[in-house]
């Protein structure tokens, strides 16, 4: 008996130990804590050092793109550019260059020869060959002619530039990281600027870059020649050369209907507007320019057609705005639905619905007394108002106060439910339908992009929303709204005293209580009912449900 009790006691201890092992760890996905067993065993998180501090690097700040034209040269992966791989045929050979020479036939040789300080390479059995100052394209012919002086036949020659002389070049002035940078003599100016981090986009110049050798200026470089015309003079660098980026010169800004909306730099005190436009590249259809001048205490604006740009000048600090300024001469509308005529019509600006209805060719199924009009500008406005209502609803649900812990938990669940509802409602696209009045439909002004729909005759009544079986029911004279709902199984249990609206075929919205008789083509929409202790939330959801039903003919459930 004692043995049996001992076995039970040991088993109970093991079970308690197992349960303690299971419960000792918090869920890291919920708490963000490390497993407690790892801490007890002396294990450390990967992001912690020996002192217990978190070594996780902070996220990198977002890169702010400069508006300065030319700054894109030094953005992205181009900053990691290496030395030039290929060589320019016009490259002039210098002491320190490495030359690959191959001889085969009666005499063979294969080796890399370095140009000595006197400008020579030494070929076995041939002697010194002076190649310094010779272009890369003439190298093979020169070496061949020297070999032929010794071996007149049965010896073939191939010579090529293997590696240019390594050099160190100073990059200074208004660059991000001034200093001394290594490369080869054939590297371009851009290579060295990239190694220095590029031109400082806030202070440096893209049009005033000087390359000096000692006290002598070797070249003046304008990077706009490269950006706009693809021209960049290739100069060979030597040890100790200096690239100097000057300070920012005069600037003007371009905005509006252009392909290059940037701030541009120029060297002179003024620049022709025609040249500025050639840099900015106006989009097709641009008609006018606005010049905003900021000089002294005054700010002036000048407005001209683009055709009058010749002869006008921009000065330092000016802003050039390119715009499209033309009036609407005609409009285009689409006619869809049940008719036998054209589906697109071009009309004079200011035309009315009468001009369209006179050209429509109705057929036997056309319901001409229920013409529908859909307008993009109305749809956009409906979307804006819907988003505003959704924003207010979300704010009301998240700012609700609670007096007890249980009430706070319920409020949190309600806020999550409303957030999911708001996310679904934001995806709804309103139709932009304009409700037409039969008495003055002919005088309705049309806009470009309007869609006119001629509905088709039907004998059905649609029932949507909070009914057991949403369906289409055959129209029958004398049947009421309640009768059609009963045909679809009646209201759902959660609908209660739901709001019911009727949408006529011409787009008119009417409360079900105000409908005397239903017509073929009507739609019955039973809106869901939502109750909350927060009056603002209840009012907000009810408003949004109605907007969705009326504006998009959509019923969303929570």
Curated annotation (Swiss-Prot):
It holds the Pfam family SLBB. Keywords: Capsule biogenesis/degradation, Periplasm, Signal, Transport. It is found in: Periplasm. One of its GO terms (cellular component) is periplasmic space. Residues 1-20 form the signal peptide. GO terms for molecular function: polysaccharide transmembrane transporter activity. Involved in the translocation of the polysialic acid capsule across the outer membrane to the cell surface. May function as the periplasmic binding element of the PSA transport system, in which it transiently interacts with the membrane component of the transporter, binds polysaccharide and transports the polymer to a component in the outer membrane. To E.coli K1 KpsD. This is Polysialic acid transport protein KpsD. It comes from Escherichia coli. The lineage of its organism: Bacteria, Pseudomonadati, Pseudomonadota, Gammaproteobacteria, Enterobacterales. The gene is kpsD.
């Amino acid at each position: 008996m004692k043995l049996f009790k001992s076995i039970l006691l040991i088993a109970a201890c093991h079970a308690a130990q197992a349960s303690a092992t299971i419960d000792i760890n918090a869920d890291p996905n919920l708490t963000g804590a490390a497993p407690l067993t790892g801490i007890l065993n002396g294990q450390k998180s990967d992001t912690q050092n020996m002192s217990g501090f978190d070594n996780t690097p902070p996220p990198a700040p977002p890169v702010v793109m400069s508006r300065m034209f030319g700054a894109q040269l030094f953005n992205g992966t181009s900053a990691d550019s290496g030395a030039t791989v290929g060589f320019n045929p016009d490259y002039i050979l210098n002491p320190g260059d490495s030359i690959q020479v191959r001889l085969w036939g009666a005499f063979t040789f294969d080796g890399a020869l370095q140009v000595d300080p006197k400008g020579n390479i030494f070929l076995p059995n041939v002697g010194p060959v002076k190649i310094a100052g010779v272009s890369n394209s003439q190298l093979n012919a020169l070496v061949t002619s020297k070999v032929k002086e010794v071996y007149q036949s049965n010896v073939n020659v191939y010579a090529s530039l293997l590696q240019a002389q390594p050099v160190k070049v100073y990059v200074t002035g208004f660059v991000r990281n001034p200093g001394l940078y290594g490369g080869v003599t054939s590297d371009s100016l851009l290579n060295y600027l990239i190694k220095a981090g590029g031109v400082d986009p806030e202070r440096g110049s893209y049009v005033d870059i000087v390359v000096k050798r000692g006290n002598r200026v070797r070249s003046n470089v304008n990077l706009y020649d490269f950006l706009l015309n693809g021209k960049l003079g290739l100069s060979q660098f030597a040890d100790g050369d200096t690239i100097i980026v000057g300070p920012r010169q005069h600037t003007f800004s371009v905005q509006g209907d252009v392909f290059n909306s940037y701030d541009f730099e120029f060297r002179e005190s003024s620049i022709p507007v025609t040249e500025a436009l050639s840099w900015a590249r106006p989009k097709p259809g641009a008609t006018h320019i606005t010049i905003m001048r900021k000089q002294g205490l005054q700010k002036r604006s000048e407005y001209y057609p683009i055709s009058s740009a010749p002869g006008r000048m921009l000065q330092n600090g000016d802003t050039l705005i390119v715009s499209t300024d033309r009036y609407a001469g005609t409009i285009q509308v689409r006619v869809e639905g049940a008719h036998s005529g054209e589906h697109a019509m071009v009309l004079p600006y200011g035309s009315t619905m009468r001009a369209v209805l006179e050209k429509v060719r109705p057929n036997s199924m056309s319901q001409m007394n229920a013409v529908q009009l859909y307008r993009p500008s109305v749809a956009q406005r409906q979307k804006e108002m819907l988003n505003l209502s959704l924003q207010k609803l979300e704010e009301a649900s998240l700012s609700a106060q609670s007096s007890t812990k249980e009430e706070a938990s319920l409020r949190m669940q309600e806020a999550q439910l409303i957030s999911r509802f708001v996310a679904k409602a934001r995806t709804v696209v309103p139709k932009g339908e304009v409700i037409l009045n039969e008495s003055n439909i002919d005088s309705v002004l049309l806009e470009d992009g309007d869609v006119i729909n001629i509905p088709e005759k039907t004998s059905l009544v649609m029932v949507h929303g909070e009914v057991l079986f949403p369906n289409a029911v055959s129209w029958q004279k004398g049947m009421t709204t309640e009768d059609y709902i009963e045909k679809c199984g009646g209201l759902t249990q959660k609908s209660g005293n739901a709001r019911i609206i009727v949408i006529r075929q011409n787009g008119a919205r009417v409360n079900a209580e105000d409908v005397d008789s239903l017509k073929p083509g009507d739609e019955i929409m039973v809106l869901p009912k939502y109750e909350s202790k927060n009056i603002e939330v209840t009012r907000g959801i009810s408003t949004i449900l109605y907007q969705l039903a009326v504006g998009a003919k959509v019923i969303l459930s929570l």
